[in-house]
Amino acid sequence: MPPSFAFVLSGNTDAFTTNLSTASVVSTSGRTVTITTNAASGWIVWVKDLNSKAGKGALQSATAGSYQIGGTSAAGAASHTLTVGAEDYGLATTINTDAAGGGVVGLDAAYDGTAAKAGTLDPTQFRPIASATGTANGDILSLVERSTIAGQTPAASDYTDTMTVIGAGVF
């Protein structure tokens, strides 16, 4: 049998479920990535951000003078709990399904989204967000962006970001 790797992203866009708020952490509705592969050594999924605020991924508003809401920790550092009332932005990855097939799915500590945490995105390079140790028959990851804002964050309805998500089998 030839090498096989299927990587299915559930959609191209992901909106926040409500307006960003100084009173709570707001999340997007999320997207899933489904991976099926016969790669004996598993698979890896990476992410890279488009917007950059001091070398950290960011939401950006054109109507607010290109204002950015960036992550607060270093890109690649362990994920953290966002602080209500302060500006922060990041990616939270969780495991929806560790399907049968032989490999064990693991989250990279930088983007581990369990317990309402998020990791600062990196606009300078692709960073791993999750991997598995063997073949997969439908492993599913959930990708959710989370953000908090401060009282002085400029009002705008066009805060956006673009992330590139890629994956590969480890043959």
Place the predicted regions along the sequence by residue:
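Signature of Gram-negative chaperone-usher
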Residues: M1-F171
